[in-house]
Amino acid sequence: MLIVVSPAKTLDYETPVPTTENTQPRFLPQSAELVDILKQKEPWRLSELMGVSDELATLNANRYQSWSLPFNEDNARQALFAFKGDVYTGLDAYSLEQDAISAAQRQLRILSGLYGVLRPLDLMQPYRLEMGTRLQNAKGANLYRFWGDTLTQSLNEEVRETGADVLINLASNEYYKAVNEKKLAVPVITPMFLDMKGGKYKVVSFWAKKARGMMTRYILQNRLQRPEEIKNFDTDGYSYNPALSDGAQWAFTRDH
């Protein structure tokens, strides 16, 4: 199986990385094209474009000004260890065994507004560019137009290379929209995570994001190969709920 997840806005370029192994992103020419557009924007323009504070806009303007090829261990970091948001708190990559990191390199793909698709050990320089950003480019008015079918084609190549027979979608809607599901070569299963709140099961954003990371970790640590095995996921009190599941939408619920 092949897993897709979202990136994170929060980054960590300080904590020592537990491996020296690294690879290069596959779409660096496209990334460079986007960076060239972003380099031309003043911080206040980035603030408007990204909906961030002046401080964050200045930080990212500086990031884009210093973004340069080639990537190496001195100026970049493996994606799996660079992202630090809720999904990656649940995944807890720094505590994965080497075998699980190797499994991640084969099975896990991170969708990215700037880099397209990243393998866990692909080096990346720090950035902020969410997939939903309306960045005018040569192909259209946003990043969905920029990437077009590139991400879908890339995932299909990964499917052929790895022999995966299903895609496990653990990405957010914002990022998964960049994939044309109708053109994927394999079926898709989308796990949903719901918590009991106010007498009803609801998607609570923070917990759902963390749970996506925990399920990714569960798949990698246990070397799962068949989608049915995912139904045994029980981390942090979640369990498969057949009554709330519908076709390829698999529900996992938790009571508090």
From Swiss-Prot:
Listed GO biological process terms: response to hydroperoxide
Record Pfam families: H2O2_YaaD
Annotated Gene Ontology cellular component terms: cytosol
Family, as annotated: Belongs to the UPF0246 family.
Full protein name: UPF0246 protein HCH_04801
